[in-house]
Every structure is written in C-alpha cells, then in structure tokens.
Regions:
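Active-site helix of classical SDR
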Residues: 47, 83
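C-terminal helical subdomain
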Residues: 107, 123-160
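Conserved amphipathic alpha-helix within the SDR
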Residues: 1-8
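Conserved mid-core segment of classical short-chain dehydrogenase/reductases
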Residues: 19-33, 76
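Active-site loop-to-helix junction immediately N-terminal to the catalytic Tyr of the SDR YXXXK motif
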Residues: 73-81, 93, 121
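Residue(s) in the substrate-gating loop at a strand-loop-helix junction
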Residues: 67
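Alpha-helical segment proximal to the catalytic Tyr-Lys
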Residues: 52, 96-97
Length: 184
C-alpha cells in the first residue's frame, strides 16, 4: 500500500527471496515449512499485495525467481527444489488467471550463482555464475514477453534441456556435483 501510495503505480514486482538450507538441516517438516514460507508463500503474499493495484491500473508484470532444480529435482535439496517447483506452478496459474487483466507473470531462471544461499553447496565456486553478470542479463530481459526468462542464450538452452529431460538432467547434475566433492 505504501509503495502504491508513494509512486501511484506498481508496474513490476520481483520475488527474489530464497532459502536453501543445508541438506542435514532440511530433514524435518518444520524445515520444509520454513523454506516454503520464504520461497513459495513469500511470492504468493507479494502477488496478493500487488495484484489489486495492477488490475486497477490495467496491467503490470510479476516475476518469480525459480531454479532448474525445481524442474529436475536434486539429491539433498528436498525442501528447496519442491518449493521452486511450486513457485513455477503458481506463476503458471496466475498467468492463466490474469491473462485478461493485462497482468503478466514470468519466471526468472538464473544459473547456479555465487550467493550466500548457494555457498554451502558442494560445487566449486568456479562453476557458479557471477551474480553481477546474471543480474544484468536478467534485468535486460525484464521487458520480454516470454514466460521463462534466462540471463543468457546458454542458460536458456540448459533450461530447455531441463524441461525436456527433467529426471535425466537431475541425475546428471547430482552426479556431477558428487564428482566435484566426493565427501558429500
């Protein structure tokens, strides 16, 4: 309400909050609820806040940051991956429900990026993308009409492979990560 009052319009809203606990920290239901509270329900609450304003003004754009592991699954990310899959399903449902109102929904698919939430993953930092490059690439695509937005052509191809071969890609990513860190 304060944002709408101050700026008169809300043209875009981006949900980029993320909680990705370490494997051993996400074995109970409470951990799963906490992850869903941030990753899924945070996006739902954002949508519930901005949607009435966007409908009144005749349009707007809502973006949710998703993850390839929400498509493929990933060993050890049993709280995070399903929360991102649910987030993608929410974006699809909202896109269908708001199609006639001029409000569009989009999902951002960044690659594995060097952030605090990915620091514990058993992946060498060299294999993680630079957050500045990813952020700039995604920002350039925020005006695109595509539902799935990636920061680069390579990431778009990799994301398409995840959609085409989800379980196969999940196995591959899990195996590659295990090879990078045999102790994991």
């Amino acid at each position: 309400e304060a944002t709408a009052a101050q700026f008169a319009r809300i043209d875009a809203a981006i949900h980029n909050a993320c909680l990705c606990p370490k494997v051993q920290e996400a074995r109970d239901s409470a951990s799963h609820r906490e992850v869903f509270d941030v990753n899924y329900f945070g996006a739902l609450h954002l949508t519930q806040c901005v949607l009435p304003h966007m409908r009144r003004q005749g349009g707007g754009r809502v973006f949710f940051t998703c993850s390839g592991v929400g498509i493929t699954g990933f060993a050890g990310l049993t709280a995070y991956a399903p929360s991102k899959a649910a987030l993608e399903a929410l974006a699809k449902c909202c896109a269908l429900e708001c199609a006639g109102a001029g409000v569009t929904f989009h999902i951002l698919h960044p690659p594995l990026t060097r952030t605090r939430s990915s620091a514990f993953l058993p992946v060498p930092p060299a294999f993680m993308a630079d957050p500045e490059i990813v952020g700039r690439g995604l920002a350039k695509r925020l005006t695109s009409r595509r539902f799935v937005l990636c920061h680069s052509l390579l990431q778009r191809v990799q994301t398409q492979a995840c959609y085409l071969f989800p379980l196969r890609m999940g196995r591959l990513l899990t195996r590659m990560t295990a090879r990078c860190n045999p102790r994991a």
